[in-house]
Amino acid sequence: MSKKSARNIKPGELNLKEKLVHINRTAKVVKGGKRFGFNAIVVVGDKEGHVGYGLGKANEVQDAIAKGVEDGKKNVIKVPIVKGTIPHPIVAKYGSAKVLMKPATPGTGLIAGGAVRAVLEMAGIHDILTKSLGSSNPHNVVKAAIKGLQSISDANDVAERRSKTLQEVYES
């Protein structure tokens, strides 16, 4: 997917839903004891091919979630979905987290765990096989999944890159 088309998405026009992936409590040690803060990873999507993630930090959980949702709306990408799945297998890596995603036949279901499941549900993918390898840190797993979905090229992108028609791409 080209970066140009990702910038054309206007989150205000989409009916975005949010899903909380992870909340982390942090502590800062001060003279009088510990001061707690929170950060939240939130995935937003319309379940029709648009998905984004955001990280919010605040002193209260609800504020952190709200900030995460706002950040997520700024990072929305378009995912090409073909018959409820992805067009081709992908392996994406972010930090030490690695996510493997394979297309599946209709009726297989969403086979994914933890953070990857949230991303794929919000994107609207119904049939897919995934495996999360390496680090299980939700921050990096979400970013690896988004990076993988962003790297998907549909038939139109391939035809454009090869300077061919869509028919020629399918014949080759």
Curated annotation (Swiss-Prot):
Molecular function GO terms recorded: rRNA binding; structural constituent of ribosome
Stretches assigned to the S5 DRBM domain: 16-79
Superkingdom classification of source: Bacteria
Pfam family, one: Ribosomal_S5
One GO BP: translation
InterPro entries xrefs: Ribosomal_Su5_D2-typ_SF, Ribosomal_uS5, Ribosomal_uS5_bac-type, Ribosomal_uS5_C, Ribosomal_uS5_N, Ribosomal_uS5_N_CS, Ribsml_uS5_D2-typ_fold_subgr
GO cellular component term, pick one: small ribosomal subunit
Keywords: Ribonucleoprotein, Ribosomal protein, RNA-binding, rRNA-binding
KW Ribosomal protein (keyword) present: yes
Complex and partners: Part of the 30S ribosomal subunit. Contacts proteins S4 and S8.
Protein family (similarity comment): Belongs to the universal ribosomal protein uS5 family.
Function: With S4 and S12 plays an important role in translational accuracy.
Domain notes: The N-terminal domain interacts with the head of the 30S subunit; the C-terminal domain interacts with the body and contacts protein S4. The interaction surface between S4 and S5 is involved in control of translational fidelity.
Protein known as: Small ribosomal subunit protein uS5
